[in-house]
Swiss-Prot record:
GO molecular function, one term: zinc ion binding
Protein's name in the database: DNA (cytosine-5)-methyltransferase 1
Principal localisation: nucleus
UniProt record, GO biological process: DNA methylation-dependent constitutive heterochromatin formation; methylation; negative regulation of gene expression via chromosomal CpG island methylation
Protein's gene: DNMT1
Family: Belongs to the class I-like SAM-binding methyltransferase superfamily. C5-methyltransferase family.
Region (8 X 2 AA tandem repeats of K-G) residue spans: 1020-1035
Residue span, BAH domain: 667-791, 883-1011
Length: 1537
C-alpha cells in the first residue's frame, strides 16, 4: 500500500479530498495523462475563469491537431503550476466561490453533483473487482480516446485505466512523504506526479514552487518556439500568395470556434443540457450473480434441471430500467456503442419471465447489470408489440418499462422500432410507392398506446433512417433469392440518399440481432394479366430468343461493369457455402451455371446504384444526326452476273432507253418486281428494294430501286418481325449487276372485318419463311418514327414505265418547302411586288397577320429588363452556415431563361429585289410589315401582361422589313369592336386568335385609338401602297373568320373508354376539345373513382381490376358482379389511359424474371384491351421515362403489338408547360389510329417555356427521334407563371381545412378568368393544405421570401415551437474536407464522414432548424437544392407530385409568400384543372388524385389534333365541308362538357 500524500487544502470540499485520495491509491494503474485528466476534471470547476479559458483553447488546439499530445500535457502542467506559484501558494484565489463568498455553497454543489449523481457509481468503480469488466475496459478505451476530447468537462466520470502512453512509473513509497517545510500543501501537490527527478527534489525540499513555475514557463516557451519554427518552415516552402492565405487562416481560426467536448464513452456532448446522470441504485440492489440466484426469480422446483445445457442463458424481464456508461451518463444503447465495445450497464427491477406486470412488485432490485453484450428485437410478427432485449454474460433480459429518468431516451428507441415496423409492413404490399407516399403513411399512422409521443413525423423517419433501412435489409435477407429486394424500391432509395444511410452493416458483426425473425407473407402484386392471343404470342413466344440473348449480354456486362462496391461489410465477408447460390458454385462442387453471388454477399450499394441508374434519363441527350436517310449506310457489292434485256425498249428519251424486262443469270425481272441487293459486309442481311424503272445509258445497264426498310432498322429494332418490311421515302439509281436475286414482297392490307377480329386466335406469322418471301403493311417515317398506312398514288399513263412513289413524295415535300411568290402586282423602286407568297404549303397574302421569330425585329420602346437576381451580399456565416452552398445561379422553376413569344406583324407588302438582269430575285423574298406590340413590349413591361388577356395586342404604325424565312405561321388579328360576338367567344373559337382595341405610340408612351387602315378590314383601296387595300380585303380577318361557320356536317363525339382513369384529367381535356364522350372508365382506387363520378355523372365507372373486367368481356359476359353494363366489341371508338409501369421499371435490362413481370404488367393488359376492342383511336400516356425503360424495350414492344394489330402508330414526348400550365411535366405519348383513319400529329406548343425543360427528343438504339413539332424555340403566347395561376386565392394558414370558402376578390389574370369559369355563385373548394409538424412549420416560417430561397437560407438558431418545445442549434463538429472552413474559421462538417472517415451514428443530431441530414449528404446530391424551397411568383411549379413535402422529390412546394405548403386547389390549378372540378376524399387523397392526373390542357391539345383527323376523314369520305376543330376555349373551359 503506497503512503498517502499530504491532505489537500481545506478550501476543497471534503468529498473532493476523498476522491483525490482514492485517485492517489490507484496511481499505479494510471498513466501520467490519465492522472492529469482525472485530477483536472475534479478541480476544474474551482479554477478561475481565465485559467479555464486557456485550458479550453488548448483543448481546441489538440482537437484540431494543431498541438501534439506531448506539448499539450506539458502546457497544461506549466499553466497550472504558474498560476499556483503566482499566488505564492495561496490556493484560495484559484477557486471561484459563490457570489456571497461562502465556500459552503460550492461544497454542497459538489456533494450534489458528485455524490448525488455519481456517488453510487463511485463505490462500484472503487471496488472494480470484476475481471471481465476490467479486461474489456482496457481493450475498448483506445478505440474511443482518439476521437474524443482529451480532457472532459467536470461532471464526466472517471477516465479509462488503460496505460495508453506507458510513461507513468510507480514511484517508491518513500518519495511520497509530507513536505518537511511545514507549510500547508496547495493544489500544486495534487499535480506533482511529474518526473522521478522532480519528486526526489521535493523530498529534499530543494525546489520551491516559484522556481518550479519559472522552470516550467521556460519549458513552455521552448515548446512554443519549436512549434513556431515548425510552422515557419511549412509556410516558407509555399508560394507568396499561399503564405498570405495561411496567415489569414491562422488569424481567423479563433479559439471561439472550438468543438464542444464529448464524453469519451457515450459520445454525448458534455455541455448538452439534456445530458443526464444515473441517479444511483437503492441500498438493497444486488449484484448480477447474486440477483440471479434469488429465489423470487427461480421458475424451477428443486427436483427439476434448470437448463437443457450450460450454454443456455436464463431469461428474465427487467422493469424500471436505466442504461448508462461507466461515467454514469444515461445513454441510448442503439447508437453503435455496444458494437464498438463501449461498456454499457443497466439497473432496474428484474422479474421472472412469466410476469407481465411492469410495476416494481415482485421484482428483485439489481445494480450495474452487464456490461451489455448484445441487444435484440423480437415479436416482429405483425402484432402490435415489438420486444427489445439485452444479453449479458449471465442472462437474457426482456425490457418492460423504463425508469422515469430513462423514459425520454427509451421513447426514441420505441419510436424507431414502430417506425421500421410501419415501413416494412407498408412496403410488403406497396413496392412502387414514392418517398412522399411513405411519408403519408407514416404521418397518418397512430402510434400505439402508452408511448410518450402522439404522431410520427418526417423528422422522426430521417432520425431513424439508418435503423429502418437496416430492418429492410434484414427483411430482404429473409426473402427468396429471386425476389427483387425491397431496398431498391423508389421510396427506400430516396430515403437512403436523403438521410445518408450506410448500407451493408452486417448483423453478425454488429451486436444487434433480430431474434427469430418472422417472415411476413409478401403481397403477390396485381392479378395475372389478361391478354388476347395475339398479344400473348408476341410476348411469350416471339421473343424467347431475344431474352436469352439479352441474358447472355447481361452476363458479359456483369463481368465487365457490374462491380460490387467492395467497401461495405457485406462485400468483405466470405461466401457462406450453404445457400443455393454457393452450392451452385464450382468451388463448392456445383455446376457454376447460375452465376449468382452468395446470398450473404449481395451488395446493397450495387443494387441501389443500379436501380438509380435505371431511373435516371439524361436530359442532355447527346447530339446525334436525325436518321433522315439510311441510304448512306448501304454499301453494296457488285455480282458477276450475265445480264441481257428481254424485248425492245418501251420508251426512249434520247439519252436513256427504258425496258420492261431483264434476264439476270437465267432469272427474268420485270418493272415492279422486288429484288435483293448484296451488302458490302457479308455479315449483314440483304438489302431489299422494288424495281421501279430499268434503262440503259452511258453508265451501263441501270435500274431505279425504291428501298424497303427492314423492321430491325426502324424504331422497333430487334422486336420487329424478321419478315416484315416497311415502305420508306428512299430510292436510288444503280447498276443491275448489284442485284443478288428476285424476292417476293407481299402487301398485307387490313381485312374487311378488321375491327371485329380483335381477340380472336390468330396466327402470329403473316407469311411462311422460305428465305425469299417478305411482307409489308405500313409506310415508315424515319425522322418522326411514324408507322402509317402506305400512301396511295396512281401514276400517270405517260410516266408509268418510270414512276417511283418515293420520288413523287420527295418532290412534293421539296416543292412545299421552297418559298415562292405568286400573283405579281407592280414594280417600283427596284422591287417587284406580289399579292401572295407560299411556304410549307401555307399561303400568305397582303393583309394577313403572321408569326415571326423573336429576333425578326425589335421594338423602339425598350421595356425594363426582367429583374435579374440581386448580387450576392456578404452573409453572416455563423448565423447562416449553409448559405455557402448556394454558388449556382440556376434556380429550378425560374423563367429567367424563358424565350420571348413570337413577334406578330401584319403584312403590308410582299416583294423581291430586282437583279441587274432585270429579273426579280425570287430566292430572297421580303415582307414589309406593321408591328404589333404585346403588353410586355410597351413601357408598362411585365406588370401590364399579368392583368391583360394573353391574346391582347396593340396596333402600331411602326413598319419594318423582314425576311420571309422568319415567318413561322399565320394567325388572326382583329379589331375588338369590329367583332359581332364577344371577345371571349371569339378567342375560344379557334387557335391563333388575337385582338386589339388600342394602338400604341412608343414615342409618346401613350395608347391611342387605332387608325382606320388598321381597323377597317373591309375598306378596300384605302391608304397608300399597291394593292394593299385589296389585300386587306382578303385578310385573315375575312377569310379565316368565314371558316368556323358551321356547315351541314357535325363531328360526332367518339365513344371513349378511359382505363386507369384516375380522377379524370385525360377525359376532361378530351371533353374540352369536344372530341370524345367518356361512357366508361376503369379506376381501382376508390377515392379517384368517386372523383371521376362527381365530374362525369353519365359515365359508368368500374372500380375493379381491369384484368378481371377484360376476362369477363372476353368470356361473353354482359355485366359485372355489380350489374354494371360492360362495353362490348364495336362499342369503343377511343381507348385512352396511363397504365402504371412501376412493376418493371426497376431494372434496365430484361432477364427471364423481369421479363415475366413485364408480361404480367398493366401495359400488356392495356394493349390487350386495344386488341380486343379495336378502337378507332388509341392513346397511351406515361412518364417521360417510359420511352427509355429497359433500353427502350417497353416502348418497342408496345409499338410492335400495335403494328401487328394493324394500327398506324407513333410516339413522342410533350411538355405540359408548353400548353398553358405553370408546371414542368414531360409526358410520353403513344398515339395509334385504326386502318383508314388519319394518324394524328402531335400538337404544336402554344406557350413558350423554360428551354431546360423542353428537351423532348428521344434516343433509341443510338438513333435520335423527334416528334413533328416545329415550334421548338418559341410559341404564340408567353409562359404561364405561378402568379398567373394562384395570386387571386385568399390567404390561408398551415393546416387550413375549410373545404369551401369564398374567393374574396375578382380574378386578376387571364388564366384565372379561364380557370374560374362562369359560376353563378362562385365557391372556392379544396383550398386546404397539409398540417405540418411544429418543427417543419418553424422551418417554413424561417425560409426567406426572396426567389430561390430554400433550406440553405435557414438560420442556425434555437426557436420555440408551437407545441411548446424548443429546437436546438445544429453543431458543426468536424472539419469538412471538401468545403473547408467558413470565413469566420468555423467548422462545416456535421459527421465524421466529412473528414473522409465512416459515418458515426453518435454524430446524428435532431430537432434542429437546419435538418442535420441535408448538410450530412449535401455534397453528394447537388446540395439538395430546392428542398424547403419557395415557389417563385414569376416561375413555375416542379412536376406536381402526389404529396407535397418540403423534403420530397418535388422540392419547391412552399407558397411564395405564406408559411405553408401549396394547397390542393393550387396544385389542381398548376395541372390546369378548372376550379369547378371536384375532388374526393381526405387531403392526401386529393393531392394524390391531382398529382397522378394528366393536365387537362395537354389532353385538350391532343384531343384537338384527334378531332382534326376525324374531320379530315369525314371530308374525304363525304366530299362536303365539315366544321373544323371545334369551339375551343383559349386554354381550358370551366367545367366538363
Amino acid at each position: 500500500m503506497p503512503a498517502r500524500s499530504a491532505p489537500p487544502p481545506p478550501a476543497l470540499p471534503p468529498a473532493l479530498r476523498r476522491r483525490l485520495r482514492d485517485l492517489e491509491r490507484d496511481e499505479d494503474s494510471l498513466s501520467e495523462k490519465e492522472t492529469l485528466q482525472e485530477k483536472l476534471r475534479l478541480t476544474r470547476g474551482f479554477l478561475r475563469a481565465e485559467v479555464q479559458r486557456r485550458l479550453s483553447a488548448l483543448d481546441a488546439d489538440v482537437r484540431c491537431r494543431e498541438l501534439s499530445e506531448e506539448r499539450y500535457l506539458a502546457k497544461v502542467k506549466a499553466l497550472l503550476r504558474r498560476e499556483l506559484a503566482a499566488e505564492n501558494g495561496d490556493a484560495a484565489k484559484l477557486f471561484s466561490r459563490a457570489s456571497n463568498g461562502c465556500a459552503g455553497n460550492g461544497e454542497e454543489e459538489w456533494e450534489r453533483g458528485g455524490r448525488g449523481e455519481d456517488g453510487a457509481m463511485e463505490v462500484e468503480e472503487a471496488a472494480a473487482s470484476s475481471s471481465s469488466s476490467s479486461s474489456s475496459s482496457s481493450s475498448s478505451s483506445s478505440s474511443s480516446s482518439s476521437s474524443s476530447s482529451l480532457l472532459p468537462a467536470p461532471r464526466a466520470r472517471k477516465a479509462r485505466r488503460s496505460r495508453s502512453n506507458g510513461e507513468s512509473k510507480k514511484s517508491p513509497a518513500s518519495s511520497r512523504v509530507t513536505r518537511s517545510s511545514g507549510r500547508q500543501p496547495t493544489i500544486l501537490s495534487v499535480f506533482s506526479k511529474g518526473s522521478t527527478k522532480r519528486k526526489s527534489e521535493e523530498v529534499n525540499g530543494a525546489v520551491k514552487p516559484e522556481v518550479s513555475a519559472e522552470k516550467d514557463e521556460e519549458e513552455e516557451e521552448e515548446l512554443e518556439e519549436k512549434e513556431q519554427d515548425e510552422k515557419r518552415i511549412k509556410i516558407e516552402t509555399k508560394e507568396g500568395s499561399e503564405i498570405k492565405d495561411e496567415i489569414t487562416q491562422v488569424k481567423t481560426s479563433t479559439p471561439a470556434k472550438t468543438t464542444p467536448p464529448k464524453c469519451v464513452d457515450c459520445r454525448q456532448y458534455l455541455d448538452d443540457p439534456d445530458l443526464k446522470f444515473f441517479q444511483g441504485d437503492p441500498d438493497d440492489a444486488l449484484e448480477e450473480p447474486e440477483m440471479l440466484t434469488d429465489e423470487r426469480l427461480s421458475i424451477f422446483d428443486a427436483n427439476e434441471d434448470g437448463f437443457e445445457s450450460y450454454e443456455d442463458l436464463p431469461q428474465h424481464k427487467v422493469t424500471s430500467f436505466s442504461v448508462y456508461d461507466k461515467r454514469g451518463h444515461l445513454c441510448p444503447f442503439d447508437t453503435g456503442l455496444i458494437e464498438r465495445n463501449i461498456e454499457l450497464y443497466f439497473s432496474g427491477a428484474v422479474k421472472p419471465i412469466y410476469d407481465d406486470n411492469p410495476c416494481l412488485d415482485g421484482g428483485v432490485r439489481a445494480k450495474k447489470l452487464g456490461p451489455i453484450n448484445a441487444w435484440w428485437i423480437t415479436g416482429f410478427d405483425g402484432g402490435e408489440k415489438a420486444l427489445i432485449g439485452f444479453t449479458t454474460a449471465f442472462a437474457d433480459y426482456i425490457l418492460m418499462e423504463p425508469s422515469e429518468e430513462y423514459a425520454p431516451i427509451f421513447a426514441l428507441m420505441q419510436e424507431k422500432i414502430y417506425m421500421s415496423k410501419i415501413v416494412v409492413e407498408f412496403l410488403q404490399n406497396n413496392r412502387d410507392v414514392s418517398y412522399e407516399d411513405l411519408l403519408n403513411k407514416i404521418e397518418t399512422t397512430v402510434p400505439p398506446v402508452g408511448l410518450n409521443f402522439n404522431r410520427f413525423t418526417e423528422d422522426s423517419l430521417l432520425r431513424h433512417a439508418q435503423f429502418v433501412v437496416e430492418q429492410v435489409e434484414s427483411y430482404d435477407e429473409a426473402g427468396d433469392s429471386d425476389e427483387p429486394p425491397v431496398l431498391i424500391t423508389p421510396c427506400m432509395r430516396d430515403l437512403i440518399k436523403l438521410a445518408g444511410v450506410t448500407l451493408g452493416k452486417r448483423r453478425a458483426v454488429r451486436r444487434q440481432a433480430i431474434r427469430h425473425p418472422t417472415r411476413i407473407d409478401k403481397d403477390k402484386g396485381p392479378t395475372k394479366a389478361t391478354t388476347t392471343k395475339l398479344v400473348y404470342l408476341i410476348f411469350d413466344t416471339f421473343f424467347s430468343e431475344q431474352i436469352e440473348k439479352d441474358e447472355r449480354e447481361d452476363d458479359k456486362e456483369n463481368a465487365m461493369k457490374r462491380r460490387r462496391c467492395g467497401v461495405c461489410e457485406v462485400c468483405q465477408q466470405p461466401e457462406c457455402g450453404k445457400c443455393k447460390a454457393c452450392q451452385n458454385m464450382v468451388k463448392f462442387g456445383g455446376s457454376g451455371r447460375s452465376k449468382q453471388a452468395c446470398l450473404q454477399r449481395r451488395c446493397p450499394n450495387l443494387a441501389v446504384r443500379e436501380a438509380d441508374e435505371d431511373e435516371e434519363v439524361d436530359d442532355n441527350i447527346p447530339e446525334m444526326p436525325s436518321p433522315k436517310k439510311m441510304l448512306q449506310g448501304r454499301k453494296k457489292k457488285q455480282n458477276k452476273s450475265r445480264i441481257s434485256w428481254v424485248g425492245e425498249p418501251i420508251k426512249s428519251d434520247g439519252k436513256k432507253d427504258f425496258y420492261q424486262r431483264v434476264c439476270i443469270d437465267s432469272e427474268t425481272l420485270e418493272v415492279g418486281d422486288c429484288v435483293s441487293v448484296s451488302p458490302d459486309d457479308p455479315t449483314k442481311p440483304l438489302y431489299l428494294a422494288r424495281v421501279t424503272a430499268m434503262w440503259e445509258d452511258s453508265s451501263g445497264q441501270m435500274f431505279h430501286a425504291h428501298w424497303f426498310c427492314p423492321g430491325s432498322d426502324t424504331v422497333l429494332g430487334a422486336t420487329s418481325d424478321p419478315l416484315e418490311l416497311f415502305l420508306v421515302d428512299e430510292c436510288e439509281d444503280m447498276q443491275l449487276s448489284y442485284i443478288h436475286g428476285k424476292v417476293n414482297v407481299i402487301y398485307k392490307p387490313p381485312s374487311e372485318n378488321w375491327a371485329m377480329e380483335g381477340g380472336l386466335d390468330m396466327e402470329i406469322k403473316m407469311v411462311e419463311d422460305d428465305g425469299r418471301t417478305y411482307f409489308y403493311q405500313m409506310w415508315y417515317d424515319q425522322e418522326y418514327a411514324r408507322f402509317e398506312t402506305p400512301p396511295r398514288a396512281q401514276p400517270m399513263e405517260d410516266n408509268k414505265y418510270k414512276f417511283c412513289l418515293s420520288c413523287a413524295r420527295l418532290d412534293e415535300v421539296r416543292h412545299k418547302e421552297i418559298p415562292k411568290v405568286a400573283e405579281p402586282l407592280d414594280e417600283g423602286d427596284g422591287k417587284m411586288f406580289y399579292a401572295m407568297a407560299t411556304k410549307n404549303g401555307v399561303q400568305y397574302r397582303v393583309g394577313d397577320s403572321v408569326y415571326l421569330l423573336p429576333e425578326a425585329f425589335s421594338f423602339s420602346m425598350k421595356p425594363a429588363s426582367p429583374a435579374k437576381r440581386p448580387k450576392k451580399e456578404a452573409v453572416d456565416e455563423d448565423l447562416y452556415p449553409e448559405h455557402y452552398r448556394k454558388y449556382s445561379e440556376y434556380i429550378k422553376g425560374s423563367n429567367l431563361d424563358a424565350p420571348d413569344p413570337y413577334r406578330v406583324g401584319r403584312i403590308k407588302e410582299i416583294f423581291c429585289h430586282i437583279r441587274t438582269n432585270g429579273k426579280p430575285n425570287e430566292a430572297d423574298i421580303k415582307l414589309r410589315i406593321w408591328k404589333f406590340y404585346r403588353p410586355e413590349n410597351t413601357h408598362k413591361s411585365m406588370k401590364a401582361t399579368y392583368h391583360a388577356d394573353i391574346n391582347l395586342l396593340y396596333w402600331s404604325d411602326e413598319e419594318t422589313t423582314v425576311d420571309f424565312c422568319a415567318v413561322q405561321g399565320r394567325c388572326t388579328v382583329v379589331y375588338g369592336e369590329d367583332l359581332t360576338e364577344s371577345i371571349q367567344d371569339y378567342s375560344a373559337g379557334g387557335l391563333d386568335r388575337f385582338y386589339f382595341l388600342e394602338a400604341y405610340n412608343a414615342k409618346t408612351k401613350s395608347f391611342e385609338d387605332p387608325p382606320n387602315h388598321a381597323r377597317s378590314s373591309g375598306n378596300k383601296g384605302k391608304g397608300k401602297g399597291k394593292g394593299k387595300g385589296k389585300g386587306k380585303g382578303k385578310s385573315s380577318t375575312t377569310c379565316e373568320q368565314s371558316e368556323p361557320e358551321p356547315t351541314e356536317l357535325k363531328l360526332p363525339k367518339l365513344r371513349t373508354l378511359d382505363v386507369f382513369s384516375g380522377c379524370g384529367g385525360l377525359s376532361e381535356g378530351f371533353h374540352q376539345a369536344g372530341v370524345s364522350e367518356t361512357l366508361w372508365a376503369i379506376e381501382m382506387w376508390e377515392p379517384a373513382a368517386q372523383a371521376f363520378r362527381l365530374n362525369n355523372p353519365g359515365t359508368t365507372v368500374f372500380t375493379e381490376d381491369c384484368n378481371v373486367l377484360l376476362k369477363l368481356v372476353m368470356s361473353g359476359e354482359k355485366t359485372n358482379s355489380l350489374g354494371q353494363k360492360l362495353p362490348q366489341k364495336g362499342d369503343v371508338e377511343m381507348l385512352c389511359g396511363g397504365p402504371p409501369c412501376q412493376g418493371f421499371s426497376g431494372m434496365n435490362r430484361f432477364n427471364s424474371r423481369t421479363y415475366s413481370k413485364f408480361k404480367n404488367s398493366l401495359v400488356v393488359s392495356f394493349l390487350s384491351y386495344c386488341d380486343y376492342y379495336r378502337p378507332r383511336f388509341f392513346l397511351l400516356e406515361n412518364v417521360r421515362n417510359f420511352v427509355s425503360f429497359k433500353r427502350s424495350m417497353v416502348l418497342k414492344l408496345t409499338l410492335r403489338c400495335l403494328v401487328r394489330m394493324g394500327y398506324q402508330c407513333t410516339f413522342g414526348v410533350l411538355q405540359a408547360g408548353q400548353y398553358g400550365v405553370a408546371q414542368t411535366r414531360r409526358r410520353a405519348i403513344v398515339l395509334a389510329a385504326a386502318p383508314g383513319e388519319k394518324l394524328p400529329m402531335f400538337p404544336e406548343p402554344l406557350h413558350v417555356f423554360a428551354p431546360r425543360a423542353c428537351q423532348l427528343s428521344v434516343v433509341v438504339d443510338d438513333k435520335k427521334f423527334v416528334s413533328n413539332i416545329t415550334r421548338t424555340y418559341s410559341g404564340p403566347f408567353r409562359t404561364i407563371t405561378v402568379r398567373d395561376t394562384m395570386s387571386d386565392l385568399p390567404e390561408i394558414r398551415n393546416g387550413a381545412s375549410a373545404l369551401e370558402i369564398s374567393y374574396n376578390g375578382e380574378p386578376q389574370s387571364w388564366f384565372q378568368r379561364q380557370i374560374r369559369g362562369s359560376q353563378y355563385q362562385p365557391i372556392l373548394r379544396d383550398h386546404i393544405c397539409k398540417d405540418m409538424s411544429a418543427l417543419v412549420a418553424a422551418r417554413m416560417r424561417h425560409i426567406p421570401l426572396a426567389p430561390g430561397s430554400d433550406w440553405r437560407d435557414l438560420p442556425n438558431i434555437e426557436v420555440r415551437l408551437s407545441d411548446g418545445t424548443s429546437t436546438r442549434k445544429l453543431r458543426y463538429t468536424h472539419h469538412e474536407k471538401k468545403n473547408g472552413r467558413s470565413s469566420s474559421g468555423a467548422l462545416r462538417g456535421v459527421c465524421s464522414c466529412a473528414e473522409g472517415k465512416p459515418c458515426d451514428p453518435a454524430d446524428r443530431q435532431f430537432n434542429t432548424l437546419i435538418p442535420w441530414c441535408l448538410p450530412h449528404t449535401g455534397n453528394r446530391h447537388n446540395h439538395w437544392a430546392g428542398l424547403y424551397g419557395r415557389l417563385e411568383w414569376d416561375g413555375f411549379f416542379s412536376t406536381t407530385v402526389t404529396n407535397p413535402e418540403p423534403m420530397g422529390k418535388q422540392g419547391r412546394v412552399l407558397h411564395p409568400e405564406q408559411h405553408r405548403v401549396v394547397s390542393v386547389r393550387e396544385c389542381a390549378r398548376s395541372q390546369g384543372f378548372p376550379d369547378t372540378y371536384r375532388l374526393f376524399g381526405n387531403i392526401l387523397d386529393k393531392h394524390r388524385q391531382v398529382g397522378n392526373a394528366v393536365p387537362p390542357p395537354l389532353a385538350k391539345a391532343i384531343g384537338l389534333e384527334i378531332r382534326a383527323c376525324v374531320g379530315a376523314r369525314m371530308r374525304e369520305e363525304s366530299g362536303a365541308a365539315v366544321a373544323p376543330p371545334a369551339p375551343e376555349k383559349m386554354e381550358m373551359t370551366a367545367a366538363a362538357d
